[in-house]
Amino acid sequence: MTTTIQQRSGASSWQSFCEWVTSTNNRLYVGWFGVLMIPTLLAATICFVIAFVAAPPVDIDGIREPVAGSLMYGNNIISGAVVPSSNAIGLHFYPIWEAASLDEWLYNGGPFQLVVFHFLIGIYAYMGREWELSYRLGMRPWICVAYSAPVAAASAVFLVYPFGQGSFSDAMPLGISGTFNYMLVFQAEHNILMHPFHMLGVAGVFGGSLFSAMHGSLVTSSLVRETTESESQNYGYKFGQEEETYNIVAAHGYFGRLIFQYASFNNSRSLHFFLAAWPVVGIWFTALGVSTMAFNLNGFNFNQSILDGQGRVLNTWADVLNRAGLGMEVMHERNAHNFPLDLAAAESTPVALQAPAIG
């Protein structure tokens, strides 16, 4: 009899746990994806904070020239970063137990892999949790589809790009200046600014910001008046009220006269679909562009200069971009025996544009 009671108690505890995990009445929904998300994001956050503050220098290039990224080694909030794992490790999975000692693991940049892998699993689980909560509430699943855009971008810079380049040392450092360094080197090696998918991403981000600002300002400027002319319109509303607070017909009429009639939406669902789809599709394309450039399918280049009848170079903006890219690439490649191939294999290139003779 005692054994039977214990089994029922165990089953009841598990059932209670399942109900708590999947309950939509909790202040914060957990969900089964949340069971995976919470520990992975906690592990990534804790390791990131400790590494950002106190990690020793990392031999990122694999040439015994460690690069310091933590605050305790002289960096500040702007210059600090969790430095990517060493080029000597390459694409090998490098958990703590693969190193001979903790010092070796830190020297080869093991914390970077720990943070990135747990972070990626965490954001994948967060996306699944968005779908799970939508499913429990009977909603449509497009929230997690929209979130897939930044997830794809993070996957591109932290996972796909290192795979394509052959080493996690080429991944984006986890810091402010490290992000800028990654962007400069990416431009130097892949000419990302001349890649059409990056252009679509820029249009998506800036266009999305513009449309969001236009929509928000238009809605808050076309309130349905519930007060007299002598009172503020704001007094006619309560936060979270069920009644509609603005008139989309009035907003449509205003915007149609400001631009032209068919530039404005008269259907709220179409409008909000557009507001969601524009930046999401743009960021999808950027992630796709980074993922293709990871395997050196680069942006357009203008390596052939324009020449006049005597064979002299007519310097154009393309030449300026090329020289800037070569300069960034030289600064990046601190390793003498890993000199940029487009410099080492070609004829010498003048560093500056030709200046006219003075006097």
Swiss-Prot record:
Residues annotated for Fe cation binding in this entry: 215, 272
A Pfam short name: Photo_RC
Site note Stabilizes free radical intermediate, residues: 190
EC id: 1.10.3.9
Major site of localization recorded for this protein: membrane
Chain positions recorded as pheophytin a binding sites: 126
Keyword Endoplasmic reticulum: no
GO biological process, one term: response to herbicide
Residues annotated for a quinone binding in this entry: 215, 264-265
InterPro entries, sorted: D1/D2, Photo_II_D1/D2_sf, Photo_RC_L/M, Photo_RC_L/M_CS, PSII_D1
Site (Cleavage): 344-345
Presence of the UniProt keyword Flavoprotein in the record: no
Molecular-function annotations in GO: chlorophyll binding; electron transporter, transferring electrons within the cyclic electron transport pathway of photosynthesis activity; iron ion binding; oxidoreductase activity, acting on diphenols and related substances as donors, oxygen as acceptor; oxygen evolving activity
Positions bound to chlorophyll a PD1: 198
Subcellular location(s) per record: Cellular thylakoid membrane
Catalytic activity: 2 a plastoquinone + 4 hnu + 2 H2O = 2 a plastoquinol + O2
Positions annotated to bind chlorophyll a ChlzD1: 118
Positions of the propeptide removed during maturation: 345-359
Binding residues for [CaMn4O5] cluster: 170, 189, 332-333, 342, 344
Membrane topology (UniProt): Multi-pass membrane protein
Purpose: Photosystem II (PSII) is a light-driven water:plastoquinone oxidoreductase that uses light energy to abstract electrons from H(2)O, generating O(2) and a proton gradient subsequently used for ATP formation. It consists of a core antenna complex that captures photons, and an electron transfer chain that converts photonic excitation into a charge separation. The D1/D2 (PsbA/PsbD) reaction center heterodimer binds P680, the primary electron donor of PSII as well as several subsequent electron acceptors.
UniProt xrefs under PANTHER family: PHOTOSYSTEM II D2 PROTEIN (PTHR33149:SF12), PHOTOSYSTEM II PROTEIN D1 (PTHR33149)
Subunit structure of this chain's protein: PSII is composed of 1 copy each of membrane proteins PsbA, PsbB, PsbC, PsbD, PsbE, PsbF, PsbH, PsbI, PsbJ, PsbK, PsbL, PsbM, PsbT, PsbX, PsbY, PsbZ, Psb30/Ycf12, peripheral proteins PsbO, CyanoQ (PsbQ), PsbU, PsbV and a large number of cofactors. It forms dimeric complexes.
Family that this chain belongs to: Belongs to the reaction center PufL/M/PsbA/D family.
Record-linked NCBIfam families: psbA
The protein's name: Photosystem II protein D1 2
UniProt source species: Synechococcus sp. (strain CC9902)
Lineage of the organism: Bacteria, Bacillati, Cyanobacteriota, Cyanophyceae, Synechococcales
Gene: psbA2
